[in-house]
Amino acid sequence: MKFTNTSVLFAASTFAFPANVQRDNTLQISEFRASTSIIDSASMHFVVTDANYPDDTPTDCNLLWTYGSSPEARARCNNSQYYIRFPDGPVDFNLFTLELERVSGPIAEKGQAKLSSKSAPWKCVKNPKEGIELQCEYDGVLRMKV
């Protein structure tokens, strides 16, 4: 009988304390591009893929605002699950920090990436076509640590 009681207690403790869940420590950002027009409007687009939340991603993230100012403080990706922020203030596409933070869920995530047009893979071109003052694009997939 002692063996049976011990076995039941061991089995119950195994179910009470599940193994640690493996988590991914990066967000993948693809299709990352931004541009400004000659009338000072700015736009940014990227796609977030998060291995920790496969049911919510990939999701598009799109921003429109007046260049030289900051986008809306509580801007979110299209699925509403990621805040988009620029912690260094108003965005200059030649040098800026992008911050993403998961709005809710069991795995908290917040990460930043600094981008500079002076070094690949973030590339910016001045006056690429009529009406566009600056056009920038990330070559490849950006992996943001969270």
Residue ranges and their predicted role:
Residues M1-R23:
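Fungal secretory targeting signals
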Residues N5, N20, N25, N52, ...:
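Detector for Asparagine
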Residues A11-A16, C61, G111-S116:
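Small-side-chain structural scaffolding
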Residues A19-S70:
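Short, surface-exposed binding/anchoring microloops in extracellular/periplasmic proteins
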Residues S69-V146:
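Acidic, low-complexity intrinsically disordered segments
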